[in-house]
Regions:
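A hydrophobic, multi-pass inner-membrane permease signature
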Residues: 1-204
Length: 204
């Protein structure tokens, strides 16, 4: 409602659920600005890459950890869950990205976050509770490999969890703001969220 209300009504805090003083000048300004249009398509493109890579990494980690036959799976699960509880801090992280030449690039917003311990835990739990071992054992007896079982049996039966995590990854990346603010300085590489913030502050 505020986006199509007059600035006077917004500043006076008169807008709640219904627009007052209908005004679309802000939308006209945004869509006439080539930078914002570019940032929107760039953000969609980056979110798609992030979501696909995140699902691939999450699946590759969760599937083997869901199998009882994997030796040391408890240890590996513990190691992979550590980032969920501890963070290196902003300055060490910034220096690491600098040494890896990731600063001011699209990949600094993708690679560090494609592995999510939380999403991996959800997918691992789904595999353990919803995919019976007998189904995979039957496939092994028929000569199927681990990859064939994963792609031809497990993933087709896991559409619900894949759709859920796809939503988690996509919404999480789309709403992320702080990392772009810390690590991106080039305007053409800024996602739409950061550019809109700059636009609001009069920096564009």
């Amino acid at each position: 409602a505020k986006s199509v209300s007059s600035s006077n009504a917004v500043m006076a805090k008169e807008v709640y659920f219904v627009a007052k003083g209908f005004n679309i000048s802000m939308y006209e300004t945004i869509f006439k600005d080539g930078q914002l249009i570019h940032a929107m398509f760039y953000s969609v493109y980056m979110t798609m890459i992030f979501t696909v890579l995140g699902l691939v990494v999450c699946t590759c980690a969760a599937y083997p950890l869901s199998k009882k036959r994997l030796k040391g799976r408890t240890f590996f699960s513990f190691i992979l869950m550590i980032p969920m509880y501890f963070s290196a801090g902003l300055i060490p992280t910034y220096l690491l990205y600098k040494d890896l030449n990731l600063l001011d690039s699209m990949w600094v917003l993708i690679l560090p976050l494609i592995f999510s311990p939380y999403n991996m835990l959800i997918m691992r739990s789904f595999f353990q509770s919803s995919i019976p071992d007998s189904l995979e054992e039957s496939a092994f007896l028929d000569g199927a490999t681990n990859f064939q079982i994963l792609f031809r049996i497990v993933l087709p039966l896991s559409k619900s969890i894949i759709a859920t995590l796809l939503l988690f990854y996509a919404v999480g990346r789309w709403n992320a703001f702080a990392d772009a603010q810390y690590y991106i300085t080039t305007k053409s590489l800024k996602p739409i969220q950061l550019l809109l913030s700059d636009f609001e502050r009069g920096r564009v």
